Swiss-Prot record:
<dbReference type="GO" id="GO:0045171">
    <property type="term" value="C:intercellular bridge"/>
</dbReference>
<dbReference type="GO" id="GO:0097546">
    <property type="term" value="C:ciliary base"/>
</dbReference>
<feature type="region of interest" description="Disordered">
    <location>
        <begin position="1"/>
        <end position="60"/>
    </location>
</feature>
<dbReference type="GO" id="GO:0031514">
    <property type="term" value="C:motile cilium"/>
</dbReference>
<dbReference type="GO" id="GO:0030175">
    <property type="term" value="C:filopodium"/>
</dbReference>
<dbReference type="GO" id="GO:0015630">
    <property type="term" value="C:microtubule cytoskeleton"/>
</dbReference>
<feature type="region of interest" description="Disordered">
    <location>
        <begin position="207"/>
        <end position="231"/>
    </location>
</feature>
<keyword id="KW-0243">Dynein</keyword>
<dbReference type="GO" id="GO:0120293">
    <property type="term" value="C:dynein axonemal particle"/>
</dbReference>
<dbReference type="GO" id="GO:0005930">
    <property type="term" value="C:axoneme"/>
</dbReference>
<dbReference type="GO" id="GO:0036126">
    <property type="term" value="C:sperm flagellum"/>
</dbReference>
<dbReference type="GO" id="GO:0005929">
    <property type="term" value="C:cilium"/>
</dbReference>
<feature type="compositionally biased region" description="Low complexity">
    <location>
        <begin position="34"/>
        <end position="44"/>
    </location>
</feature>
<keyword id="KW-0282">Flagellum</keyword>
<dbReference type="GO" id="GO:0005654">
    <property type="term" value="C:nucleoplasm"/>
</dbReference>
<keyword id="KW-0969">Cilium</keyword>
<comment type="subunit">
    <text>Interacts with CFAP45. Interacts with DYNC1H1.</text>
</comment>
């Protein structure tokens, strides 16, 4: 007989219920884990409301305690070689040494399973949930009312953790979307920067070409202006000489007549 995974919650000795489970429903073949085991790290369902069994008019205290324990912490079942085994939560009262041993086992399992001391840690949460369920079991045996009150506290804590986990997952998803959008925006911006740099280089090339053309044009115009000025000066000098000659000839013609 291979029992289920070890737990800090104290159970009685497993009892063989049936030797043939071929005709049982598939659900009975699966290991039924009591609600003190936390769910996977990916989901934290809301714990179900615990329904307490009805008690007779003159209840047996031991019987009533067992029924309350089974309602709070349901027995776990598993199938091995077509044999159905069931294991109920122990109804044996605990002693001070049991509490000390529970603390030692908790510390040992935290160390063995390398649970993180801070931050979110599914392993640490699972072990502390088992420890809390064991404390609920011990208190319920001595006082059912206190046990039921602790059960309400446990369920409230689980609902709060489930709400925080849902909020955390949605925040992570929102952060991932924003990161992807930022990455996409970064890629678009880098592509736009590359296009602008290419356009800048093309404009700089055009500016250099226009500068070269402008310098060549200025040089041509300067040379042409110098040639025209030289030609203009030569024409002026020619006209001055012609004017002097004509003036001398005119004076020569007019002078003898006097």
């Amino acid at each position: 007989m291979i029992p289920p995974a070890d737990s800090l919650l104290k159970y009685d000795t497993p009892v063989l219920v049936s030797r043939n489970t071929e005709k049982r429903s598939p659900k009975a073949r699966l290991l039924k884990v009591s609600p003190q085991q936390p769910g996977p790290s990916g989901s934290a369902p809301q714990p179900p409301k615990t329904k307490l069994p009805s008690t007779p008019c003159v209840p047996d205290p031991t019987k009533q305690a067992e029924e309350i324990l089974n309602a709070i912490l349901p027995p776990r079942e598993w199938v091995e070689d077509t044999q159905l085994w069931i294991q109920q939560v122990s109804s044996t009262p605990s002693t001070r040494m049991d509490v000390v041993h529970l603390q030692e086992q908790l510390d040992l399992k935290l160390q063995q399973r390398q649970a993180r001391e801070t931050g979110i840690c599914p392993v640490r949460r699972e072990l502390y949930s088992q420890c809390f369920d064991e404390l609920i079991r011990e208190v319920t045996i001595n006082c059912a009312e206190r046990g039921l009150l602790l059960l309400r506290v446990r369920d409230e804590i689980r609902m709060t953790i489930a709400a925080y986990q849902t909020l955390y997952e949605s925040s992570v998803a929102f952060g991932m979307r924003k990161a992807l959008q930022a990455e996409q925006g970064k890629s678009d911006m880098e592509r736009k920067i590359a296009e602008l740099e290419t356009e800048k280089r093309d404009l700089e090339r055009q500016v250099n070409e226009q500068k070269a053309k402008c310098e060549a044009t200025e040089k041509r115009e300067s040379e042409r202006r110098q040639v025209e000025e030289k030609k203009h000066n030569e024409e002026i000098q020619f006209l001055k000489r012609t004017n002097q000659q004509l003036k001398a000839q005119l004076e020569g013609i007019i002078a003898p007549k006097k």
